[in-house]
Design a protein with these regions (language model features):
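Membrane-interface soluble catalytic domains
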Residues: 2-25, 37-44, 65-71, 139-143, ...
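SF2 helicase/translocase ATPase core recognition
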Residues: 466-468
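Short beta-strand segments
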Residues: 320-322, 371-378, 410-413, 435-440, ...
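Active-site-proximal alpha/beta segments of enzymes that process anionic O-linked groups
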Residues: 167-239, 244-397, 496-527
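Short, P/G- and charge-enriched loop/turn segments at secondary-structure junctions
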Residues: 224-227, 452-459
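A long, amphipathic alpha-helix that forms part
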Residues: 59-60, 220-226, 396-436, 470
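Transmembrane and membrane-interface helices of multi-pass
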Residues: 2-189
Length: 553
């Protein structure tokens, strides 16, 4: 009993002496604790998470044993605490750690980053409260204290770090080779706290510089066409890029609320019941949607001309009309828009403001072929700001947050339905041989299950499933109309938005390197997609879902 008593007394003394450091450590390690708890619910704990946790503990031991004035140490660590707060937010809401991919999205797509904050401000506020409490109490407890140092423990922890990093690097080199990629892989996998945040920041700088290089390559790249058929007969091609519009809330796909009454009445509309996106982020999905390159090779997507530039090279007058804000912080989408001959942005307007602009463009055709790209706000958060009051027809069934959000979202879909049907009327009235393609960049989470997820970026059946259809005026040639009938056979096949550029090359009669008949929805060679996509955690080769099941939920 005396041994247990002595041990308990020593433990109590240690706790009294070290509690401020332990509290601060606990907060820094909280993203890892949350990730470990998440993994414990699975059959197997991710070895990388366990490795990262051990490396983090070793770094914290070095910081504790190497300096006596822990108050100053943790004061200097304030930026890392802020990064840990963001990290914890991502783990709790998206199940992902803070990586260079997320940092790059924030750096190159300021609008998407600020929209994320607007969506999740409650969650962020809660984390800030916890941070202020832990950090404030911990610093107060350390103020005026000088704690003992342990040179031996510090050296032992450093030796453990050398061994841990070294073993992982040797493993990486054995799989690949001793080169730059091996070093970058070690940096990318270092998600320890606090030093791992420096690794992710350094990798972000590398990726940002690479992205600027891709943009320079893109500007210098040339479109290599091998042929443009005179028999295609398409005079006007309109491509509407939607925003955050998931099929679960479209009555066109079986949703009980009549959110798409106009589209349901349109003859000749070919919808896709199992359409998936290539990323649940606009900054990645839109470039992929307009590229011939696979999402597995982002470098090629970023450095080569898009469908906009291809159609321009094929002799189409190209237009980029957008109700989205101009993103002056970089990214690929502004570069895609720059490939068009004519550009117009209607910022802070409802999507309906694009209709008179489109009408004016159509009136200028004068027999020339036109390719018109419309980038709309669609159903982007905040949903209540996406439609005028005349379209506020759906009311919340109760005062719950989910019912309020769902009603606003449904009204935004209703407004998009009106926009798209209005475009169809304009194309029909123009008497041009026209084709309309619509695809949303990604879907959206609407507090659908116990996880209470809102927004996009998670990579699940709600934000990876997306809406898309093809429609044409009734005056196309008989050959073209027969060709479009093949789309009926694709209705229930799993299809990626990556197929649309290849399909449009076929319908426009354009041949060029990079065209892939296995991705062409009009080709007999077409193969159903495995729906590969990019997440903040990296490339994911497959995704499987059934929208018919989801729509019935």
């Amino acid at each position: 009993m005396s041994i247990w008593s002595a041990g308990g007394s020593a433990g109590a003394q240690l706790l009294r002496a070290q509690w401020p450091s332990l509290l601060l450590w606990a907060y820094l390690l909280s993203p890892l604790f949350a990730r470990l708890l998440s993994d414990c619910q699975c059959a197997k704990i991710d070895g990388l998470v366990l490795y990262t946790f051990l490396i983090s503990v070793l770094w914290l031991l070095v910081l504790r044993c190497g300096w006596a004035n822990q108050f100053k140490v943790h004061l200097w660590l304030l930026p890392f605490y802020l990064l840990a707060s963001i990290d914890l937010f991502l783990v709790l809401n998206f199940g992902s750690r803070l990586t260079a991919a997320y940092l790059l999205i924030g750096l190159t797509n300021y609008k998407e980053a600020t929209d994320f904050l607007a969506t999740y401000w409650r969650s962020m506020a809660g984390i800030v409260v916890v941070f202020v409490g832990c950090y404030g109490v911990g610093l107060a407890g350390l103020y005026g204290r000088r704690l003992g140092r342990s040179k031996a423990m510090c050296q032992l922890a450093l030796a453990g770090l050398v061994l841990g990093y070294g073993a992982y690097f040797v493993k990486t080199v054995s799989i690949n080779a001793l080169n730059k990629d091996a070093v970058l892989d070690l940096v990318a996998k270092d998600q320890s706290t606090p030093v791992g945040y420096l690794s992710q920041l350094a990798l972000t700088v590398v990726l940002y510089e690479e992205s600027k290089g891709y943009i320079r390559q893109r500007q210098q790249s040339q479109v290599q066409l091998t042929g443009v058929s005179d028999q295609a007969g398409i005079q006007t091609l309109v491509f509407v890029i939607g925003e955050s519009s998931r099929p679960h809330n479209w009555s066109l796909y079986g949703y009980p609320n009549k959110t798409t009454p106009n589209l349901e009445r349109q003859p000749g509309l070919f919808k896709f019941n199992r359409m998936c996106t290539t990323a649940p982020y606009t900054s990645v999905a839109v470039p992929s949607l307009l590229s011939l390159e696979p999402i597995s090779d982002w470098n090629l997507i970023a450095s080569n001309k898009s469908l906009v530039g291809i159609l321009r090279a094929a002799g189409f007058d190209t237009y980029w009309l957008s109700s989205q804000e101009v993103d002056s912080f970089g990214g690929i989408i502004p570069q895609i828009a720059a490939e068009a001959q004519y550009r117009q942005y209607l910022e802070r307007s409802y999507d309906g403001a694009l209709l008179p602009v489109l009408q004016n463009v159509l009136s200028k055709a004068n027999g020339r072929r036109q390719a018109i790209f419309l980038h709309i706000k669609g159903s982007h958060f905040e949903y209540a700001r996406r439609f005028p009051s005349d379209f506020a027809r759906f009311k919340p069934a109760s005062g719950s947050q989910k019912d309020r959000i769902t009603a606003d979202y449904d009204n935004s879909v209703l407004y998009t339905d009106w926009i798209l049907s209005s475009i169809m009327h304009q194309l029909t009235a123009s008497q041009s041989k026209a084709l309309l393609v619509y695809a949303s960049d990604h879907g959206e989470n609407l507090l659908d299950d116990d996880r209470k997820l809102l927004g996009h970026g998670m990579g699940n059946a709600y934000d990876l499933a997306t809406t898309a259809f093809v429609w044409s005026t009734g005056n196309l040639s008989a050959a073209q109309m027969r060709k479009l009938q093949k789309l009926k056979t694709r209705q229930d096949q799993q299809v990626s938005i990556a197929s649309l550029p290849h399909t449009l090359l076929n319908i426009a009669g354009i041949t060029m390197p990079g065209y892939d008949s296995t991705q062409d929805l009009l080709s007999d060679d077409f193969k159903a997609s495995l729906c590969p996509h990019l997440l903040g955690t990296g490339y994911v080769p497959t995704f499987d879902f059934s929208i018919k099941h989801i729509a019935a939920e």
